[in-house]
Amino acid sequence: MALTAEEKQDIIAKYATHEGDTGSPEVQIALLTKRIADLTEHLKFHKHDHHSRRGLLLMVGDRRRLLDYLKKVDIERYRSLIERLGLRR
């Protein structure tokens, strides 16, 4: 269910803007997107898990705020990330 260390490192390596980058908006959004996808799959089988559903909604809100920030700061990085992650916007 949770991200393994290997999965996390793969995502960080794929979306990092420079060596050792773990906090850029791109990396944070990519990690949240993976967690959101995993939790969405969990909720398909456990429809009454309302505690996890609330966590999912909080993560979606966090990702939305990070995407809005990235869009405001650098629209080209935003468009590139949306395309790479396959998010609708």
Swiss-Prot record:
It holds the Pfam family Ribosomal_S15. It comes from Bifidobacterium animalis subsp. lactis (strain AD011). Belongs to the universal ribosomal protein uS15 family. This is Small ribosomal subunit protein uS15. Disulfide bonds: none annotated. SUPFAM superfamilies: S15/NS1 RNA-binding domain (SSF47060). Keywords: Ribonucleoprotein, Ribosomal protein, RNA-binding, rRNA-binding. It comes from the Bacteria. NCBIfam families: S15_bact. GO terms for cellular component: cytosolic small ribosomal subunit. One of its GO terms (biological process) is translation. Part of the 30S ribosomal subunit. Forms a bridge to the 50S subunit in the 70S ribosome, contacting the 23S rRNA.
